[in-house]
Amino acid sequence: MLKPIRFWVCLVLILGMPRVFFAQDKTPYRLVNPFIGTGNEGNCFPGAQAPFGMLSLSPNNTFDNYEDAASRPGYKYFRNEINGFGLTHYSGVGCHAMQDLQFMPVAGTLDKSPVNDKHAYVSRFSHEREKAMPGYYSVTLDDYHVDAKFAATVHAAIGEITYRGDQEAHLVFAPTNCANGIGDGELHIESTAMTVTGWVSTGGFCWRDPKDRPYRVFFVAKFNTKFSSYGVWKGKAKAEGASNVAGDDVGAYVSFGKLNGKAVKMKVAISYVSIDNARKNLQEEISCWEFEDVCRATKSQWERMLSRLTVEGGSESQRQAFYTAVYHNLLHPNVYSDVNGDYMGFDDKVHRVANGRKQYANFSLWDTYRTTATLQALIAPDEASDMAQSLLLDAEQGGAYPNWSMNNVEYGVMNGYSTFPFIANLYAFGARNFDLQATKEMMKRVSVKHIKCKGFHGWEHVEDYMAYGYVPVDRHGHGASMTLEYAIDDFSIAQICKAAGDEAAYNYYMNRSQSFEKLFDEETRLLRPRNADGSFLTPFAPNMEKGFNEGNAMQYFWSVPHNVDALTDFCGGKGAMEKRLDTFTSQVKCGWAPDVPYYWLGNEPCFGSVYVYNFLGKAWKSQRMVRNVLNRFNDTPNGLPGDDDAGAMSALYVFSAMGLYPYIPGIGGFVVTGPLFTKVQLQLKGGKTLTLIGENAGNDAPYIQRLQVDGRETTSTWLDWNKLKHGARLNFVMGKGPNKQWGATEKDAPPSYY
């Protein structure tokens, strides 16, 4: 588990260690590039964050147009101005979120109010004088002649801000300039203590009003330099010398006089419970003023996490893309409890986690159950176990499991009830230190009756689903995709029930998991939206979005990972299925493409479709397509083919590059396609290692020629995790041309469940 960075980060540097923190090596840490995914696609941010950290201090450089996709993460690489630094960010999501408690170093005259005005205090910057690494961010604000650098811990951060010019130096607090504005807040200046504290109430994910499903976040900021003056803004009105302000239109500033090259140090921490808890977080994690000590401590955390999954071979660009993808999967969910264990529950009451545990928040579950859950269970099993327990606590406090949550609020922006496959994948791949029996009982409770989570979402239309065996499209516009997601949910619940020894419930949910068959349309051989009277949606076309959430009938056709055999039979057999898949994968779409009947790499429902060839005896075609997928990623700001969605897209890259994909939710096992790298090593609990050797592996050698598992030849395209989890060695021989006999027999195919 992550350990808080205690007072020891302030000890004297070990003799012989170089003063320069950033050694020029090629370790996994050094190969992470946080700017990947900050361009036109990805929606990532480059700022400083510890693994799964509550606080993420990152620049914001987007402005007024909230409907503009560019504003979603708070940062876009192609912009050349910065308007502030926020203390919370949500990586890769498709709507505006967080960017809370913005502040901005300013030099000169404070002649404008920053309240609800992102243009008030802005500086140009250059990427040549901008640097980002895990836990660290720095930039030069050209217009203010300011050099700013920041390092983060789990709950806090330290900054060193050098004002090089001869103008008055200030730091402006502009909390209204977060993603969606604020509904309320307070700022307090304690001039004698050189401290600023406060809180804001905000929310409004996906362009909503900040008073819609709000949360509160508290902060404390300390400085090592006396204030020469200070004041607040209430709306447009500036009050010099005032130290308190409250409302939904607040701002504040502290000034340091003319510094002429002197650096001001700032320490800041947040809490979702109280200002007092923010103080405790700061004291526990950064009690000193030594910037480099904090850097080293957080770097050590990142190195420890990143070293659990390593690769050799490939190009440096490919290794950089790989380690950055792993990094993206260590950002969220976020630690939500304070250093004393306090957290704000889904019942809006303060709770305390059990000793040795942490509460987590920010679950983009519709996205992350497909890939991220498995990756986190493999490389961070302790943290992943706490995530599963956190979701159970959320359900106990909020009435039901959240489906898409931010902090202690359910936003429910996607269909399905993806908490179930997320938890089932965590369990299947080794994250098992949570209350399995209570989890099983909660899953059973919320899957037979519509119980909302904190007043929202829950298993929507579950009564219709149980009555009809599907969700009618004339009762819910996404009825078809809901049915497919619910079938996966049922299968996942079944696996948890099986693990908990509840055979009757296992059989019940396994039967329910075949609900996708109710959408079989003999006329089109597609999974077609259906009305409550049993009729199919008319008119209808394969690329029609009606009935489907972010996709269409052809893109969702493959969304039956637990029973591909039944889907194949319905399609007309393996030949017909292969022909359809050939057409579907003949075009690869990135970005936004829900209305085309082809493989859409840019969104999650299509992730697994390229692996279906393994069920058809055509493993070589999956191998070819996976390499095609990998080539759509790179190590530039535009290096992701779609929203990263809290790591889901990046995790797809990781598994594709490993040549192992967790295809069936809730089942511990991988579909095999062969590695991109000559060596992959996964460190397992107990000191064991899973090693993949890729002889001849490379970008031009996507095809498996042979595979040995612990020295034994196999042609199976499915590897059972139970046979790998205690350590194993996979020896692949890769080649430039396909071995069409490898993985071609019926016994070589992955399993189907019915």
Predicted segments, located by residue:
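Bacterial Sec-dependent N-terminal signal peptides
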Residues: 1-25
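Short aromatic-glycine motifs in intrinsically disordered, low-complexity regions
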Residues: 690-699
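ATP-dependent phospho-/nucleotidyl transfer catalytic cores
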Residues: 489
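Short coil-to-beta strand junction motifs in C2/discoidin
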Residues: 675-677, 699-703
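Accessory carbohydrate-recognition regions in carbohydrate-active enzymes
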Residues: 24-421, 427-484, 492-518, 524-527, ...
